[in-house]
């Protein structure tokens, strides 16, 4: 004959109700914050006279991205096969410049960046170097930002984004003189990076 014990579980309906309401509020807040973030980026673009974005593609359509209308671009070719795509860009007011690159590299991206930092610090004066790991369009991305002294106390602020992808990595770099840098530029750069896709 079975002689088990019977356990009775009491559920406090009030606590369960509060937990359900809190979970619902948290989900709602996450959704609202994502919409707010998108609208904030759009507002920052408009406030900086960036109303439209032009489409760009590279490597026969393998990559696509957008840059603000009126920015000038120029593709360059490099020998050696390491850099297989390079497109320089400059803002219409010549304050922001940079480039989009695709590299062939089997080396781990983080190790590549650490080695690049050592080499660059040996050749240049660099301050406030910081590397963050973020997610852009579902891909792990390294954001490297720093100040670099180009000549005679002429400092430039750099924002560089690196995305690894199967034996290649993508580099999107933005540079502006430190005296011209505005806090809104970080959001502008991120809005441009959000348009970058590997097809």
Residue ranges and their predicted role:
Residues 1-89, 154, 175-199:
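N-terminal targeting sequences that direct proteins away from the cytosol to non-cytosolic compartments
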Residues 2, 7-11, 77-165, 169-171:
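Conserved polar/disulfide-associated segments of primarily extracytoplasmic proteins
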């Amino acid at each position: 004959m079975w002689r088990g014990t019977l356990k009775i579980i009491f559920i406090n309906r009030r606590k369960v109700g509060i937990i359900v309401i809190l979970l619902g509020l948290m989900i709602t807040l996450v959704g609202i914050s994502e919409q707010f973030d998108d609208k904030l980026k759009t507002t920052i673009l408009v406030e900086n006279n960036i109303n439209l974005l032009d489409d760009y593609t590279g490597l026969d359509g393998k990559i696509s991205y957008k840059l603000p209308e009126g920015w000038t671009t120029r593709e360059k070719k490099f020998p050696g096969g390491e850099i297989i795509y390079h497109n320089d860009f400059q803002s219409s007011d010549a304050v922001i410049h940079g480039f989009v690159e695709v590299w062939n590299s089997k080396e781990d991206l983080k190790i590549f960046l650490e080695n690049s930092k050592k080499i660059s610090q040996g050749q240049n004066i660099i301050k406030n170097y910081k590397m963050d790991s973020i997610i852009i369009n579902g891909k792990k991305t390294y954001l490297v930002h720093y100040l670099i002294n180009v000549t005679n106390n002429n400092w430039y602020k750099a924002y560089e984004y690196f995305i690894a992808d199967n034996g290649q990595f993508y580099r999107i770099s933005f540079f502006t003189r430190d005296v011209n840098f505005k806090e809104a530029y970080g959001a502008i750069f991120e809005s441009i990076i959000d348009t970058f896709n590997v097809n």
